[in-house]
């Protein structure tokens, strides 16, 4: 590889423990050079939490690092190999346009992957150019930071730089690179890859590495690989419940887009639901609704079953016993997911204690919302402040009956109405990344070079539970002509 390392005090404290794995898992690869990198956006709060130096990152040398033209002295740039089931079909994949610089160790001792996305061709590019366009990279920046503010586990976005290149898609677009920060980039697809093309020793090496990196607090007397599977199932049950509670539609829940760490990753065709409809799909390529909003829990269980299949040789020496162990573990997902979802929905309705009838109360509300085309986020916002008359549900007989039952339910708990309202305020965001507002910000930035619209949007999204007057603009619904929102997998 070409040597381009430089000593720059960015605050990056890099290791690359992933390279301790067998070489089947990665290829050493420098990012492609770009002609004229310029900083588009820098995440100052994230810089602070990671212990980095914002001033240096904004310098010429710092921007060169974010663009891949230079690499920190301690970096070992690699692209990672993985496979995946895409829309149910297995295929070989890998980092086709991303380079992992290494793992940054924060002053607090936390470990985070630092990855450049859109950094050029790799051995896994499969004929692609390895580049990324500015619009999709800014979009991932906005959505991932909004998800973090909403309290949903997610990869983060440290920076976006423009490259000075034009890249060809349907039209000519401005090139860009996003610096992604993640607990790790180990995916279900990473295990699928080594299960298909590696040895059992290499599979065990990956499993042991994953346990050490993400699940250190294990009881070594138990089967560590069953523990690994169970912990991933728990994390995904929590994550998917949080998606559903907030109305988030990932759009491309392939197994390569399910992380072992439990973070949301890859914001290609994702979007947030406006009108409540379980069949909501935004992705232009999901023509059969495989990854529709209401199907996300089922797909998560399916993906986890694929992970369990890869671990069978490690779960038990007897294949039949291994299958039983895996099936028992996977069967827990539905219960774990439902418990997380019900707990979250109770919070959205100001309910502290549990009653068996709660699920019916919740499902009845969702059914009424679906029937009348109620906005998901704004309905719960209206319930929080008892101003439902401002929504399409105002005056509807079914809703009035439901409302009475809900009020009766609230009287059957010790907590006060004020406490219930506080719980609802902390459970129901006043603002989400509305699709039309995100597009408005992207259009200003990409077409006009005006980042002020995006900055204002990011500021509003950084305080989703604030209920401030300034957020009203970002809570308004799209015009009917823009309701048929469709996304494309640009990220």
Swiss-Prot record:
Belongs to the SELO family. It catalyses: L-seryl-[protein] + ATP = 3-O-(5'-adenylyl)-L-seryl-[protein] + diphosphate; L-threonyl-[protein] + ATP = 3-O-(5'-adenylyl)-L-threonyl-[protein] + diphosphate; L-tyrosyl-[protein] + ATP = O-(5'-adenylyl)-L-tyrosyl-[protein] + diphosphate; L-histidyl-[protein] + UTP = N(tele)-(5'-uridylyl)-L-histidyl-[protein] + diphosphate. Its cofactor is Mg(2+); Mn(2+). InterPro entries: SelO. Signal peptide: none annotated. Keywords: ATP-binding, Magnesium, Manganese, Metal-binding, Nucleotide-binding, Nucleotidyltransferase, Transferase. The active site is at residue 256. It comes from Clostridium botulinum (strain Okra / Type B1). One of its GO terms (molecular function) is ATP binding. ATP binds at residues 94, 96-97, 117, 129-130, 180, 187, 266. It is an enzyme of class 2 (transferase). NCBIfam families: PRK00029.1. This is Protein nucleotidyltransferase YdiU. Mg(2+) binds at residues 257, 266. Its EC number is 2.7.7.-, 2.7.7.108. Nucleotidyltransferase involved in the post-translational modification of proteins. It can catalyze the addition of adenosine monophosphate (AMP) or uridine monophosphate (UMP) to a protein, resulting in modifications known as AMPylation and UMPylation.
């Amino acid at each position: 590889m070409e040597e381009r390392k430089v000593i720059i005090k960015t605050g990056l404290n890099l290791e690359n423990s992933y390279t301790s794995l067998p070489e089947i898992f990665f290829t050493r690869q420098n990012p492609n050079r770009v002609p004229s990198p310029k900083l588009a956006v820098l995440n100052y709060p994230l810089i602070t939490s990671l212990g980095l130096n914002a001033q240096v990152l904004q310098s010429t040398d710092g921007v060169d690092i974010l663009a891949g033209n230079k690499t920190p002295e301690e970096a070992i740039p690699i692209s990672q190999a993985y496979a995946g089931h895409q829309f149910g079909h297995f295929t070989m994949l890998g980092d086709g346009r991303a380079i992992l610089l290494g793992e940054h160790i924060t002053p607090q001792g936390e470990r985070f992957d630092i990855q450049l996305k859109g950094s050029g061709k790799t051995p896994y590019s499969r004929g692609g150019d390895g580049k990324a366009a500015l619009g999709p990279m800014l979009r991932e920046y906005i959505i991932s930071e909004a998800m973090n503010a909403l309290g949903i586990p997610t990869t983060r976005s440290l920076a976006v730089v423009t490259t000075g290149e034009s890249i060809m898609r349907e039209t000519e677009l401005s090139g860009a690179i996003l610096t992604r920060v993640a607990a790790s980039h180990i995916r279900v697809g990473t295990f699928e890859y080594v299960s298909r093309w590696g040895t059992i020793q290499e599979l065990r090496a990956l499993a042991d590495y994953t346990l050490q990196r993400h699940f250190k607090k294990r009881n070594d007397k138990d089967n560590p690989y069953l523990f690994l599977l169970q912990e991933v199932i728990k994390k995904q049950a929590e994550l998917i419940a949080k998606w559903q509670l907030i109305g988030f539609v990932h759009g491309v829940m392939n197994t390569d887009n399910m992380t072992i760490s439990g973070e949301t990753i890859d914001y290609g065709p994702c979007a947030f639901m406006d009108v409540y409809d379980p069949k909501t799909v935004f992705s232009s390529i999901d023509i059969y609704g495989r990854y529709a909003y209401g199907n996300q829990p089922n797909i998560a269980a399916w993906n986890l079953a694929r992970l369990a299949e890869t671990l069978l040789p490690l779960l038990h020496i007897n294949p039949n016993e291994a299958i039983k162990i895996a099936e028992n573990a996977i069967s827990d997902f539905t219960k774990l997911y439902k418990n997380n979802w019900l707990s979250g929905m109770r919070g959205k309705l100001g309910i502290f204690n549990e009653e068996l009838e709660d699920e019916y109360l919740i499902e009845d509300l969702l059914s009424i919302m679906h029937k009348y085309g109620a906005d998901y986020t704004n309905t719960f916002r209206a319930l929080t402040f008892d101003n439902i008359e401002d929504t399409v549900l105002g005056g509807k007989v079914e809703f009035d009956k439901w409302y009475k039952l809900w009020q009766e339910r609230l009287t059957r708990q010790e907590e006060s109405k004020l406490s219930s309202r506080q719980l609802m305020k902390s459970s129901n965001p006043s603002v989400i990344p509305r699709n039309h507002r995100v597009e408005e910000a992207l259009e200003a930035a990409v077409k006009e070079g005006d980042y002020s619209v995006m900055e204002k949007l990011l500021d509003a999204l950084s305080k989703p539970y604030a209920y401030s007057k300034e957020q009203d603009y970002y809570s308004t619904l799209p015009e009917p002509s823009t309701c048929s929102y469709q996304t494309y997998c640009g990220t």
